[in-house]
Amino acid sequence: MDRGTLATKHANVYAIGDVTTIPIPGRWRPDVPLILPKAGVFAHGQALVVAQRIAAEISGAQPDVKFCADGYCMLEAGEDLAGFAFGNFFAEPSPDVRLRKLGRAWHIGKVLFERWWLAPFGIRRELLGATIKLGGKAYGVPVVL
């Protein structure tokens, strides 16, 4: 499977989510390579890439979008506090993942994201998405929903 296009060796077949084993830079142990974690953030990003590639192919265009392995995770700490880890898992020589300081804002962001994710399509979901994007801009976090 190509880690950027997510295309398999079979024509017109892509792989996303937990069925993938995508090597990333670095080693777990000398004899064990690192692989991209099995996390929803990566499956979501992979689905967006594959959908855009299929749409381009159907319309006769050459697809150029690639999966970049940028990932993030909110880390709940209790008492309405959370941390935020994010990074580029394809960075060389090893994944570049950073952890932001615990704070209430990350907890609020997590709650908003959960509400957005579970909301039916409509004005409420759009407003939640706009709020998340605004918060992302304020905190220097790229947001792709």
Where are these predicted regions, by residue range?
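Short, low-complexity, polar/charged sequence segments that are solvent-exposed and flexible
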Residues: 18, 33-36, 61, 92-96
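FAD-binding beta-loop-beta segment adjacent to the flavin cofactor pocket
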Residues: 1-15, 77-95
